[in-house]
A protein has these predicted regions:
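Bacterial Sec-dependent N-terminal signal peptides
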Residues: 1-23
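Beta-propeller folds
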Residues: 19-171
């Protein structure tokens, strides 16, 4: 009886394996690639996420529960002192009070690039450049959100946000 049940299970397994042929063309066309969601960034409250608009002019807030838009975090048309027409990406500070807006992205090699970054204050809707001395790479907020480190010309710089955005070279 046991041998018969194992034989039946193997028989059905072999039938299902032969049901679909996988071709090299299917693999090359990524037919069996897993779908994913790109470009969403969860917010601290755990109930909302942000996503950049397709035209690169707004950062929209959406509800996880409903999937519907609940507000606009940033808009190039309404931000004060905003001289850009669109942006490429953004980075939220740990407390979500500031946003680094990435513009004028220029690729260097594979995944590395330089860009001009702007600091957007969500509370007062004001925008100002991170640095006026040239494009930056890999900016990063400090854990408390009071400083931003970035790289320019293979040197590390630090911008202290509490002290008038003073920029100092670390290396």
């Amino acid at each position: 009886m046991r041998k018969l049940s194992i034989f039946i299970i193997l028989f059905f397994c072999l039938l299902t394996v032969g049901a679909q042929q996988v071709s090299l063309q299917d693999v090359a066309n990524r037919t069996y690639r897993a779908e994913g969601i790109r470009g969403i960034k969860p917010m601290l409250d755990g109930e909302h996420y942000t996503q950049m608009s397709t035209d690169g002019k707004k950062i929209m807030q959406y509800s996880f529960k409903t999937g519907k838009e609940t507000g606009t975090i940033f808009d190039v048309n309404t931000a004060r002192d905003c001289s850009i027409k669109s942006f490429d990406d953004y980075i939220m500070s740990p407390d979500e009070k500031l946003i680094l807006i990435q513009t004028d992205t220029k690729p260097i090699y594979r995944r590395s690039f330089t860009a001009n970054y702007y600091i957007f204050n969500v509370k007062n809707n004001k925008m100002e450049p991170l640095s006026e001395n040239g494009p930056q790479q890999v900016p990063l907020f400090s854990p408390d959100g009071n400083q931003i480190a970035f790289v320019r010309d293979n040197n590390i710089y630090l911008v202290k946000l509490l002290f008038g955005n003073s920029e100092s070279q670390v290396t």
